[in-house]
């Protein structure tokens, strides 16, 4: 095989590797964007649930120390 042909084959292999890496990079970027979207959504939900819990705790429910013990005590 001539040196010219070997070089052309090597260049072709490198071009294919670059194409696959570009595709993989695009897929990973898409996955990262989706994960960040999911994280942002979960943070909003967590804040909402934390506020609901605060509201629940500060409602008219007596704390455990204020509750009268059950009759079997």
Swiss-Prot record:
Pfam families: SlyX. InterPro entries: SlyX. Belongs to the SlyX family. This is Protein SlyX homolog. The lineage of its organism: Bacteria, Pseudomonadati, Pseudomonadota, Gammaproteobacteria, Pasteurellales. The gene is slyX.
């Amino acid at each position: 095989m001539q040196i010219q042909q070997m070089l052309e084959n090597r260049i072709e292999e490198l071009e294919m590797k670059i194409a696959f890496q570009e595709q993989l990079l695009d897929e990973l970027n898409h996955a990262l964007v989706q994960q960040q979207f999911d994280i942002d959504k979960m943070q909003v939900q967590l804040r909402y649930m934390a506020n609901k819990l605060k509201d629940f705790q500060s409602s008219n429910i007596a704390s455990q120390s204020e509750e009268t013990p059950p009759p079997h005590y």
